[in-house]
Structure formats: structure tokens, C-alpha cells
């Protein structure tokens, strides 16, 4: 699954882009406005075709207002709750993680690497940093659950809070990347303490 794309790359092209835009904004734009909001990623013709197809599927409603036609999500459509969940792959990843970790032993789970920076592809691995107690040893199990739930291989780095702080002080590149680009999925990013002296 491509965690960087709406719907994880399952619904692609103009149809996926239009559907993601309408689900995320809750707005009621015209077809031309949808096209402009997509920043030219798709032609006006392909946006109009996508809107037509989504209206035919019943997921999107069209309403005539004066000389214009506006589009909105049909909130009564049976697929909309699932589509809302799918439009946010990082949210789905968070759900997978929360279902398989003991939050009493884990302070934070942080997404980092290409998936966090927006440079991932469908076959990119998912890099996670787990900061927790020294007796937490579920990295292999967590990686398996993430792979099963998302379809991507998963690499898990594990730190205690003290180990993470020490790695920050040493200036370890991977920890710098985590602090710079990391997306907290559980808990929060550790705050870097200013050096004294």
C-alpha cells in the first residue's frame, strides 16, 4: 500500500484524486473548482469524467445552483464511511499499530523515512521507531502485523527513552531524521533537550 497516497494507491488517477478532495474538504465545488484545487495534476476533461463516474456510482451528488453544477459526497452511500477511512492511509497504519501494542509499555511510535517524507512508493518499507520501556520486545510481532495490515514490509527500531536521548546527544543520523521528519502515530515526538554548558 502506498501510505503517501489517498486510498493507499487503491483508487488512482483523476477518480481517486477527485474523490479524496471531496471527502477531505467537505466542500461543494463546481467541476472547474475541483480541477483548480487539484493543481493541474489532471486535465479538466479527466476531472469531469471522474465526477460523472462518481455520480453514476452514487457516491457523489450533483446539484444545479443557478448556471452551475456543484458536487458533494453522498453521506448516505454505504461506502462513504469506508472511503473516509481509506482516504487516510496513515490513519489506517495508526489503527493497525494501536491494535497490536501495549501502550502502557510504549511511550511513542514514530513513522519516519521515505513514508514520512512523502518520497515512498507502493513497495516502500514502513520505518517505525518505538520508544518504550526496556522490557518491551515486540518489534518482530509489530512488524508482522504492520506487514499483514498494510502490505508493506516494516522495519522497527526500538529505543528506551534514555537510549533515544543518548542517540540525540551523539548526533546519530537516524535519530536526527526521526526528529526532523517523524510523524508520531502513538504518543508524541520526544523533545530535544537543549545542551547545558
Say what each PLM segment does.
Residues 1-107, 117-123, 132-197:
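Catalytic core of pol beta-like nucleotidyltransferases
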Residues 127-128:
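Conserved, compact domain cores that house catalytic/ligand-binding motifs in diverse enzymes
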Amino acid at each position: 500500500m502506498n501510505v503517501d497516497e489517498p486510498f493507499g494507491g487503491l483508487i488512482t488517477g483523476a477518480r481517486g484524486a477527485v474523490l479524496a478532495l471531496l471527502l477531505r474538504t467537505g466542500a461543494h465545488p463546481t467541476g472547474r473548482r475541483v480541477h483548480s484545487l487539484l493543481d493541474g495534476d489532471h486535465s479538466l476533461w479527466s476531472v469531469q469524467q471522474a465526477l460523472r463516474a462518481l455520480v453514476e456510482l452514487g457516491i457523489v451528488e450533483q446539484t444545479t445552483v443557478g448556471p452551475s453544477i456543484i458536487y458533494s459526497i453522498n453521506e448516505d452511500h454505504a461506502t462513504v464511511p469506508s472511503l473516509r477511512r481509506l482516504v487516510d492511509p496513515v490513519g489506517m497504519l495508526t489503527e493497525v499499530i494501536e491494535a497490536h501494542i501495549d501502550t502502557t509499555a510504549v511511550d511513542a511510535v514514530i513513522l519516519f523515512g521515505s513514508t514520512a517524507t512523502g518520497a515512498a512508493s507502493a513497495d516502500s518499507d514502513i520505518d517505525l521507531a518505538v520508544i518504550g520501556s526496556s522490557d518491551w520486545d515486540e518489534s518482530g510481532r509489530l512488524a508482522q502485523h504492520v506487514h499483514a495490515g498494510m502490505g508493506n514490509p516494516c522495519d522497527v527500531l526500538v529505543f528506551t527513552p534514555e537510549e533515544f536521548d543518548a542517540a540525540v546527544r551523539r548526533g546519530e543520523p537516524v535519530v536526527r531524521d526521526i526528529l526532523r521528519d517523524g510523524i508520531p502515530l502513538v504518543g508524541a515526538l520526544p523533545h530535544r533537550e537543549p545542551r547545558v554548558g
